[in-house]
A protein has these predicted regions:
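Short acidic, S/G/P-rich loop/turn micro-motifs used as interaction or catalytic elements
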Residues: 47-50, 82, 138
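Short, internal strand/loop/helix patches
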Residues: 20, 88-123, 127
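N-proximal helix/coil linker or "cap" segments that precede and/or mark the start of modular domains
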Residues: 1-20, 32-36, 85, 89
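Non-catalytic, surface beta->alpha helical segment in thiol-disulfide oxidoreductase systems
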Residues: 118-121, 127-151
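A structural signal for short secondary-structure junctions
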Residues: 12-13, 34-35, 68-70, 92-94, ...
Length: 151
């Protein structure tokens, strides 16, 4: 039952649940504060092999870099766990253009705002934070953005 309830959250076509995050500088932000046409929410753990592969795939996707440059896409990378020293150690692996934050209050995990059964997880959201793609691989996100004629 709990599994099903979690799967019901943040479905495609629904508004993604808001949460707050903290940057390495201590500055705070929230998902809903992102102003770009698209927000790519990337929930990940430092040092996880699949996370590193996803970072590389996103870094090497021309459409993603182009939209980042045009300020039409925000990549919001969020660390949902407690090991902040570990997170800080890996910060330099993320592109500077991304917003790299952590969930200081562990709300994502404790309130089960997002399904974290698989890490990393990617959500593509539109300007209104409606979920366009959920749990999608980087390639699917790239193809979606290209298909939308966002070149």
């Amino acid at each position: 039952k709990a599994r099903r309830e979690l799967a019901q959250k943040n479905r495609i076509g629904t508004k993604a649940l808001n949460f707050n995050y903290t940057l390495a500088s201590g500055a705070q932000g929230s998902l809903y504060q992102q102003k770009s046409d698209y927000t790519l929410l990337f929930i990940n753990n430092p040092g996880c092999h699949a996370c590193t592969e996803t970072i590389e795939a996103l870094k090497n996707a021309p459409i993603i870099n182009q939209l980042l440059e045009q300020k039409r896409l925000t990549v919001l990378s969020i660390y949902p766990d407690e090991e902040l020293d570990e997170w800080r150690k890996h910060l330099n692996e993320f592109p500077k253009e991304w917003v790299n934050g952590y969930d200081k209050t562990f709300a994502i995990k404790e309130q089960q705002l997002y399904d974290l059964k698989a890490i990393p997880t990617l959500y593509l959201l539109n300007k209104d934070k409606t979920v366009l793609l959920k749990d999608a691989p980087a390639q699917t996100i790239e193809e979606y953005l290209l298909m939308k004629g966002e070149q």
